[in-house]
């Protein structure tokens, strides 16, 4: 019989917010299509939404400075 898999750990949602006094600040980018509550994953050259698949590419600062 196969060994049982361990329980999968989820990410802590509290890592996505910063609380200062009475204000709450989101630390990650929010998907413009899905709205508040759906954060976008940050990759090397883009931001991606895992829910709807929306992509937003980062500006290449090296290419802009060379022009």
Curated annotation (Swiss-Prot):
Keywords: Metal-binding, Ribonucleoprotein, Ribosomal protein, Zinc, Zinc-finger. Binds 1 zinc ion per subunit. Its cofactor is Zn(2+). GO terms for biological process: translation. SMART domains: Ribosomal_S27 (SM01402). It comes from the Archaea. A zinc finger (C4-type) spans 31-52. GO terms for cellular component: ribonucleoprotein complex; ribosome. Zn(2+) binds at residues 31, 34, 49, 52. GO terms for molecular function: structural constituent of ribosome; zinc ion binding. HAMAP family: Ribosomal_eS31. Belongs to the eukaryotic ribosomal protein eS31 family. Part of the 30S ribosomal subunit. This is Small ribosomal subunit protein eS31. The gene is rps27ae.
């Amino acid at each position: 019989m196969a060994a049982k898999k361990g329980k999968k750990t989820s990410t802590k949602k509290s890592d996505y917010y910063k609380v200062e006094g009475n204000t709450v600040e989101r630390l990650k980018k929010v998907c413009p299509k899905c709205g508040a509550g759906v954060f976008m994953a940050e990759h090397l050259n883009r931001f991606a939404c895992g829910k709807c698949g929306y992509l937003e590419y980062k500006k290449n600062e090296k290419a802009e400075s060379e022009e």
